[in-house]
Amino acid sequence: MSWIQKILPRTQTSHKGNVPEGIWTKCGSCQAVLYKSELEKLQEVCPKCDHHMRITARRRIDAFLDDGDRVELGAEHEPQDVLKFKDSKRYKDRIVAAQKSTNEKDALVVMQGKLKGMPVVVACFEFAFMGGSMASVVGARFVAAVNACLENDMPLICFSASGGARMQEALMSLMQMAKTSAALAKMSKKGLPYISVLTDPTMGGVSASLAMLGDINVAEPKALIGFAGPRVIEQTVREKLPEGFQRSEFLVEKGAIDMIVDRRDMRDRLHSLLVKLHYKN
């Protein structure tokens, strides 16, 4: 202890209590600091600027469907490394890592349940699983969703969030574009409604197939939607793209999608759309 510390009076310092981790989060758009618990109640939509943050597939389904009996479809389908693919890492290892981090077997979750009492099937992409990439299991589960609708005369709603086809499955991944499109043609032939909801981001092979084949194509605000990304396009055409290019507001203005719906209003709006499509069950 120094001589100055001996002669100066001691002051009582209050110790701040430890703040538990995971209570706060920051909006990626307006940088507002938000309570995580409040944000969860708002379905991950910022109360300050209405920025739609990414949400897990199961949380989206839980918020969208009625409480009560639900049946998961296609869960028996699990990914296989048929090609023994390896880039900087083995595909098999990437699958295991993605399964551990998301607690999902693959990038699509399909659930049969009810929307305001109306029987429906909901397919929802899990973007955290390898960028929501479409591979064999995603195609198989989507077809399982369509088959359930065909067998029970139910509408299908799909929430897309994907970077496109999964590179590690090569042509088998690309084949899912044709497979899912052919399945949806059967729904159209039978007159069953299919509503596609495009969320941030919906790109590549998913946007070029099942995501744009809805009887009504809906998007969340400011969602990035397209085939190639804006940077790739700019480098290819060597021109500056218009502001907001490939965002949902730009696309609805140009007629590429039908409407933009806030996530918090999605249940009401989609139920209303199904009623207007004269769907009855």
UniProtKB/Swiss-Prot annotation:
Residues in the signal sequence: none
PANTHER family, per the entry: ACETYL-COENZYME A CARBOXYLASE CARBOXYL TRANSFERASE SUBUNIT BETA, CHLOROPLASTIC (PTHR42995:SF5)
Record gene name: accD
Presence of the UniProt keyword Zinc in the record: yes
Major localisation: cytoplasm
Bound cofactor: record note: Binds 1 zinc ion per subunit.
Cofactor (UniProt): Zn(2+)
HAMAP family with a match to the protein in the record: AcetylCoA_CT_beta
Pathway involvement of the protein, from the record: Lipid metabolism; malonyl-CoA biosynthesis; malonyl-CoA from acetyl-CoA: step 1/1
Primary role: Component of the acetyl coenzyme A carboxylase (ACC) complex. Biotin carboxylase (BC) catalyzes the carboxylation of biotin on its carrier protein (BCCP) and then the CO(2) group is transferred by the transcarboxylase to acetyl-CoA to form malonyl-CoA.
Native organism taxonomy: Bacteria, Pseudomonadati, Pseudomonadota, Gammaproteobacteria, Alteromonadales
Chain residues that bind Zn(2+): 27, 30, 46, 49
Entry EC number(s): 2.1.3.15
Catalytic activity annotation: N(6)-carboxybiotinyl-L-lysyl-[protein] + acetyl-CoA = N(6)-biotinyl-L-lysyl-[protein] + malonyl-CoA
Protein name listed in UniProt: Acetyl-coenzyme A carboxylase carboxyl transferase subunit beta
Gene3D superfamilies noted in UniProt: 2-enoyl-CoA Hydratase, Chain A, domain 1 (3.90.226.10)
InterPro entries: AcCoA_carboxyl_beta, Acetyl_CoA_COase_Trfase_b_su, ClpP/crotonase-like_dom_sf, COA_CT_N, Znf-ACC
UniProt domain CoA carboxyltransferase N-terminal: residue ranges: 23-281
Localisation per UniProt entry: Cytoplasm
Disulfide bond residue pairs: none
